[in-house]
From Swiss-Prot:
Organism: Stutzerimonas stutzeri (strain A1501)
Job description of the protein: Necessary for formate dehydrogenase activity.
Family stated for the protein in its record: Belongs to the FdhE family.
This protein's name: Protein FdhE homolog
Domain of life: Bacteria
GO terms of molecular function: ferric iron binding
Location in or out of the cell: Cytoplasm
Keyword terms of this UniProt record: Cytoplasm
Amino acid sequence: MAGTILEPGQIEAAASKPPFTNLPPRDLFALRSARLAKLAEDHPLADYLRLLAGVCQAQQQVLDNPPASAPLDPARTRECFKHAMPPLAADTLVREGAWLPLLDAWLDAFAVPDNLSVIAAVDQLRRADSGQRKAWAVALVSGQYDSLPPALVPFLGAALQLAWTHWLLQLDLSDLREREDQTLCPCCGAPPMAGVIRHRGQLNGLRYLVCSLCACEWHYVRLKCSHCRSTKKLDYLHFEGSPQGIKAEACPECNGYLKQLYLELAPDGESLSADLATLDLDLLLADQGYNRQAPNLLLAPGHEA
């Protein structure tokens, strides 16, 4: 069988080249739940973090035992890979109904706390028909937060994360094409929630962006704005002594910022929970004129404090 002969330098380059994408672990939501519960200790937003720990726990329960639902279309997936398009394109799949059974399963799994606002939000989501649910979901993934009730965001967002992560873990990404300056998730097209700076092995010192929807990680060079791609005068803002290992990469060109989790500073850190535990940093950045560009689907807009 014919093959390609690699020269010595090419062999070393191929062996040392880091992976373009990293899949989330299958216990992702359990890890998030445990981390949120830990961060809630002595935290001013303890009740909120514990609520979201329960949200993530229900996500893991359904991910471990997913309901019967329509499988991914292999022909469409192949075409997406062929044309370098996201195989789990959020703006398309969210308008279809394959994710709705996972929403229902999550609603059944979630242990609703004794909180009137949470009870009302979950009940509103439970009673909504499929058309209304899809309309809200389209608004959420497209960033049109004024088009859905803010109280629904963490719960609808949890179901969408669950569905897309479930699908992502079924994919073989070997045919996914690497592209430079990829500011949106190569698997689903959603924006990143945060960046994570690795600190071990082959990935030491590399930055990966973490998808806000499916939790795929993809390589993106450091010292470059993940929104406008500028490399000019980026600033890194953080609170001294913060145990979460979070710094915000702030860009004066677009006035946006993205939080970065440095695992060297917080080896047990996890990006979603670290983001939610450092909302005081968001307030500081807002006071300095920076705008948050990265969505966190468990965070209702306007409820950063």
